[in-house]
Amino acid sequence: MENKPILSFEKVSIIYKKAPLLQNISFKVMAKENVCLLGKSGVGKSSLLNSVTNTKIVKSGLVYFDGVASNKKEYKKLKKQCSYLDQIPNLIDTDYVYEAILRSAKQKLTWLQKLICFEPKWIKDKILAILKEVNLNDYVSCIIKDLSAGQKQRVEIAKLFFKSPKLLLVDEPTTGLDPLTASKIMDLITDFVKREKITLVFVTHDIDLALKYSTRIIALKNHALVLDRLTEKLTKEQLYKIYDN
């Protein structure tokens, strides 16, 4: 079966605070690709990623998800098959780790099960298995606010395991993390998308992470797309040029 694009940008322009941020951006992401959006901080990488689920920031052009344009009514429903992992974990500080993941797990329950607060055994078993996979099995009863930044990001990744999206958008997931923890976080993400056959688009300014974890790199500079190439055909020296003034 022919591999079709799951995500497309067609002449997309984004304005931030009344000033042009990105202009005339066009590219396609094929199913099961690991695509990295690379560039300096403030170049518009995160805004472009955010435009997939928040189309209000798109001033001109169209975003397509699974072949449906962002100006169609079906797009709003379809984009629910897309998950977004932010650089700042979206967690409740007073939750226990188990509770935080249970909130995502409850999306799989019927309205009646939610109403009577029914928690099937399979959900509990899966949560415990997931916590073991992300190396948080010793933190089940820990409060979120007591976790390190890396551990909080692991909780966010664990929440994704219940969603099984078609497309995973990841915005600077290693911000503020040491290199070893950053690699472990990226290992978890890429192992997950490979196992579940999910398409990944992630944002970073880290050239080493881009080269290690992507199959394709798209670089942004001076409001434009300046590079789109398979990762295996790129060198670190070529990517450093993107950061030149």
Curated annotation (Swiss-Prot):
One of its GO terms (cellular component) is ATP-binding cassette (ABC) transporter complex. The keyword RNA-binding does not apply. One of its GO terms (molecular function) is ATPase-coupled transmembrane transporter activity. It holds the Pfam family ABC_tran. The keyword Cell wall biogenesis/degradation does not apply. PANTHER family: METAL TRANSPORT SYSTEM ATP-BINDING PROTEIN TM_0124-RELATED (PTHR42734), MOLYBDATE IMPORT ATP-BINDING PROTEIN MOLC (PTHR42734:SF6). This is Probable ABC transporter ATP-binding protein p29. It comes from Mycoplasma genitalium (strain ATCC 33530 / DSM 19775 / NCTC 10195 / G37). The lineage of its organism: Bacteria, Bacillati, Mycoplasmatota, Mycoplasmoidales, Mycoplasmoidaceae. The gene is p29.
